């Protein structure tokens, strides 16, 4: 249920945190800060140290060939899923899906998403239902939007909800609204005791 977003630069710090919370998480999400700070091999190292599936949150948004080149590298490094933007169109999304499992962005959790991304949600859901990714990104900061997306999304496609904790989203509200996974970063990795922070969130959503 919990995806740990490891948005840090230092590989050793990332591994230490991941190992301390692995009993309470389902996946680890690595983003550009960690990959740029520690190299793409951090994906393999995290998998070896924790046994947890890895999401490469690159939000790929380029032409098909460039998306394909990047995705080939991260899947080759051991990523189980790659996040891709939907707005670049079916051809760019499919270039990544041909190489492995994908997660498509249909809405984002930050305020700026209301300007350009979120007005196209219905179109993005249509594309997701056609392509059938592993999952889609929906905002944990707006549970009513999770419910809206869940009602229109094809059965079997998972919803992953970022924005839990530091951005103001509540874990239990997101799960009740229909999220299959909640994505939590700073509320865990910046906590004085990341393991206890992860356990508290785990206990909050267990049985919801």
UniProtKB/Swiss-Prot annotation:
It comes from the Archaea. Substrate binds at residues 7, 29, 57-66, 109, 162-172, 185-186. Pathway: Pyrimidine metabolism; UMP biosynthesis via de novo pathway; UMP from orotate: step 2/2. The keyword Nucleotide-binding does not apply. The active site is at 59 (proton donor). Keywords: Decarboxylase, Lyase, Pyrimidine biosynthesis. CDD domains: OMP_decarboxylase_like. GO terms for cellular component: cytosol. Homodimer. Belongs to the OMP decarboxylase family. Type 1 subfamily. Catalyzes the decarboxylation of orotidine 5'-monophosphate (OMP) to uridine 5'-monophosphate (UMP). HAMAP family: OMPdecase_type1_A (MF_01200_A). This is Orotidine 5'-phosphate decarboxylase. It comes from Pyrococcus horikoshii (strain ATCC 700860 / DSM 12428 / JCM 9974 / NBRC 100139 / OT-3). The gene is pyrF.
